[in-house]
Design a protein with these regions (language model features):
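Acidic anion/phosphate-binding donor-loop and adjacent secondary structure
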Residues: 153-156, 187-188, 195-196, 204-219
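Active-site proximal beta-strand in glycosyltransferases
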Residues: 118-120, 127, 131-152, 176
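Carbohydrate-associated surface elements
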Residues: 38, 181, 203
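Conserved donor-binding/catalytic core segment of Leloir-type glycosyltransferases
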Residues: 176, 219-231
Length: 231
């Protein structure tokens, strides 16, 4: 499984979803290896981690040019570049496309060294890595779409990210969308066959999540504040 972040080292919901899915798969008996683009001090009992920046086996420059020849060459920068309190670079700062590219360069070697039956890649950040892993092992590729570029940017999309998403959808054996609405966007905006796109909703761990949330709500209400719940 190729991810981009994992709690507590996450900047949004993607890492939380990856944590929940990996834990659920492991509880069903799946032997899971979770790959991240950079090393972080993390360990969980249900899966093992592989950090791509520890791999020294890279593909050649010619292979790199072939891999990204279909994409634009400009860089994507965030509005601000910052470092987390733990000293790790923010996952969304700096040249994001270069980070995605570097991740993909090492994915083939990781796939070669780690036995697996299926490849699972989360969002566009990991699709090139998943594609390279599939080229090496020939195993089925499942790409998970948590949010499309249209969800993030409306109609003012970044074409480079769109092209990476499109390539991932086309080369995947299955596309997993987090909702029916996301599935429809993949079908309509990217021209992907409806038979290829399945819906798997995000789950909730009630025992883990509800009590702390209720306690937080009670503290907010005790302070005289109003609560608006969006569902």
């Amino acid at each position: 499984m190729f991810g981009w972040e994992f709690p507590p080292f996450n900047s949004g919901g993607l890492g939380v979803a990856c944590e929940g899915l990996s834990k659920a798969l492991a509880s069903s008996g799946v032997d899971l290896t979770f790959v991240l683009p950079f090393k972080i001090p993390i360990s969980v009992p249900w899966c093992r981690f592989v950090f791509s920046n520890e791999s020294t086996d890279l593909i050649s420059e010619n292979q790199m040019q072939r891999l990204f020849s279909g994409y634009q060459s400009h860089s994507i920068h965030s509005k601000s570049s910052k470092t987390q309190d733990n000293g790790l670079p923010d996952a969304v700062s700096g040249d994001l496309i270069e980070r995605v590219r570097a991740y993909a360069l090492r994915a083939g070697a990781i796939a070669k060294k780690n036995k697996h039956s299926v490849i699972h890649a989360h969002d566009w950040l990991t699709y090139p890595a998943g594609i390279e892993a599939k080229k090496v092992s020939g195993r089925p590729l499942v790409v998970h779409i948590h949010a499309t570029e249209f969800d993030r940017s409306g109609d003012n999309i970044n074409k480079e990210i769109y092209n990476i998403e499109l390539e991932g959808f086309r080369k995947a054996d299955m596309v997993v969308a987090v909702s029916g609405r996301t599935r429809e966007k993949v079908i309509q905006k990217y021209g992907i066959s409806p038979h290829k796109v399945k819906v798997v909703h995000n789950g909730v761990e009630f025992q883990k999540s509800v009590n702390p949330v209720l306690e937080t709500f009670n503290r907010i209400k005790a302070g005289g504040n109003k609560i608006v719940l969006y569902a």
